[in-house]
């Protein structure tokens, strides 16, 4: 282990505590506990003294510190066993959502009710939000207990009936859905029971002075397995690479390593292990040789790295690519509920979490909301450059003509981040598409008279070129029909059209099922001279 980097990790964590007016203790004894806040700004270590008046008291080198239980959770064998907490609604599952998003979501939800959310951490990973009317001066109108542990626990709690809402940073598995259905929970992947609330992007970061702004998946595999050890090996300076990883029990570690290696993970000890994204970002920012990975909100002053997949397609870590789900290291954040025990309080919270009203607090939490962004498609656009190369590779004929047709259309249209996806050979939208339809109609309702919106279809590479073009046009037409059906007269001022370009302009490799799923899509283009 690199001693210098380990010291940097400790120093970074100390700086975070100092920013909150606190100090980390260095003692390690049997009664030691750690007090952590959900946002990572407080991380205190000391000997447990007592729990009194909803405050933890710990002893550090600076003396006794008193910390409100509403600000932190307690970890360690010496933490007090608090009484079981009862609440109107129990929410359980992913610590990524429970600790990173739920506190602000609860506050935002309360605000829509003209209430205040009083948050108290009752135990490690457990928070109760009590909603009080009249901005906190009235009566209690509801309480929500959030237990943040793991994705698996979301479905176990729903199955056992101990939770009304489950949180997960992955989609429910077929076995989990079948088990719940057998217990009377209903169809767990129906629109009424499966809800996408946000996108989380993992971003590879380096020191801001590092001139390596792009790395291939193969190069990342080499770096995070210890086979590539010097930046010079990937076009950078002659400097040792210091890998900053997450603890192997964290969901961030699991997601990142699964993307690079699947189940066959290397036996490699990194130069530093960060306890959270904030620490990882701070360490990478201070070390010219460091590389790490953090959530989208924690890039800060570090340099984000563009990831190039096995097919040579570059994926930039920006909000637009994340919303289109064309960035390589994306995952959806889900809420789930049973059909047989959903009450009004649970439903009201879920409806808020998936609404546009929640976008602001989701963004503040460090996740990427599902709001719509708009991007020009000029001739200097990365995709336009790639398409010109693709056209040159075809013999003059049908395929080359399709590529040129797409380039002509791009020059007159901007692209919206709303992107609809389909199953293989199907015109049926996936689970996110249903939510995006409603948001798109809301967005287009404000477009000026004469705006032209084109639904542009694409496919994977399964099948012939001509058949895929017909399929892509059919999918684009089906989305257009869905939008008209949902919108009614609300978008009467818009001229709609459909186009299909088949398998050209892939966003991912067609060699994998995941890549094919990304490529089966319908994009939304809007005339450049309009301003929605």
Give residue spans per PLM region.
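Exported/periplasmic ABC-transporter solute-binding proteins
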Residues: 32-435, 439-448, 492, 532
């Amino acid at each position: 282990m690199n001693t210098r980097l380990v010291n940097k990790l400790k120093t970074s964590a100390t700086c975070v505590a100092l920013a909150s007016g606190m100090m980390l203790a260095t003692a390690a004894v049997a009664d030691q506990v750690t007090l952590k806040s959900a946002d990572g700004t407080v991380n205190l270590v000391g000997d447990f003294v007592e729990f009194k008046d909803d405050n933890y008291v710990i002893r550090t080198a600076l003396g006794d510190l008193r910390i409100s239980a509403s600000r932190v959770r307690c970890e360690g064998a010496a933490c007090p066993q608090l009484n079981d907490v009862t609440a109107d609604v129990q929410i359980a599952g992913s610590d990524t959502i429970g600790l990173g998003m739920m506190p602000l979501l609860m506050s935002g939800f309360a605000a829509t009710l003209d209430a205040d959310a009083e948050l108290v951490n009752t135990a490690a990973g457990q928070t109760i939000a009590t909603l009080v009317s009249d901005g906190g001066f009235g009566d209690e109108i509801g309480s929500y207990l959030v237990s943040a542990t793991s994705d698996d626990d979301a479905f176990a709690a729903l199955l056992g009936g101990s939770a009304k809402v489950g949180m997960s940073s992955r989609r429910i598995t077929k076995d989990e859905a079948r088990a719940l259905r057998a217990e009377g929970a209903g169809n767990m992947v129906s629109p009424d029971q499966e809800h996408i609330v946000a996108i989380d992007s993992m971003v590879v970061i380096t020191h801001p002075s590092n001139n390596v702004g792009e790395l291939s998946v193969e190069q990342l595999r080499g770096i995070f397995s210890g086979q590539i050890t010097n930046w010079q090996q990937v076009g950078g300076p002659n400097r040792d690479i210091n890998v900053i990883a997450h603890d192997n029990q964290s969901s961030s570690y699991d997601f990142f390593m699964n993307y690079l290696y699947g189940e066959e993970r290397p036996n490699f000890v990194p130069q530093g292990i960060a306890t959270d994204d904030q620490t990882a970002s701070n360490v990478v920012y201070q070390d010219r040789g460091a590389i790490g990975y953090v959530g989208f909100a924690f890039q800060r002053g570090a340099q984000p790295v563009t990831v190039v997949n096995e097919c040579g397609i570059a994926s930039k870590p920006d909000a637009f690519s994340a919303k289109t789900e064309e960035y390589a290291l994306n995952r959806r954040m889900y809420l789930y509920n049973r059909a047989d025990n959903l009450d009004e309080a649970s439903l009201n919270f879920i409806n808020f979490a998936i609404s546009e009203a929640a976008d602001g607090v989701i963004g503040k939490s460090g996740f990427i909301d599902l709001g719509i962004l708009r991007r020009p498609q000029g001739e200097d656009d990365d995709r336009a450059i790639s398409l010109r190369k693709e056209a040159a590779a075809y013999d003059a004929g049908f395929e080359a003509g399709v590529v040129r047709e797409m380039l002509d259309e791009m020059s007159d249209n901007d692209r919206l981040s709303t992107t609809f996806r389909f199953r293989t050979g199907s015109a049926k939208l996936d689970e996110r598409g249903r939510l995006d339809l409603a948001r798109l109609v809301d967005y287009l309702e404000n477009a000026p008279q004469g705006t032209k919106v084109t639904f542009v279809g694409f496919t994977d590479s399964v099948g012939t070129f001509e058949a895929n073009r017909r399929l892509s046009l059919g999918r684009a037409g089906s989305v257009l029909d869905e939008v008209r059906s949902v919108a009614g007269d609300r978008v009467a001022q818009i001229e709609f059209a459909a186009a299909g370009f088949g398998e050209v302009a892939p966003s991912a490799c067609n060699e994998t099922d995941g890549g094919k799923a990304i490529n089966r899509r319908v994009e939304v283009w809007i005339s450049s001279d309009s301003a929605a």
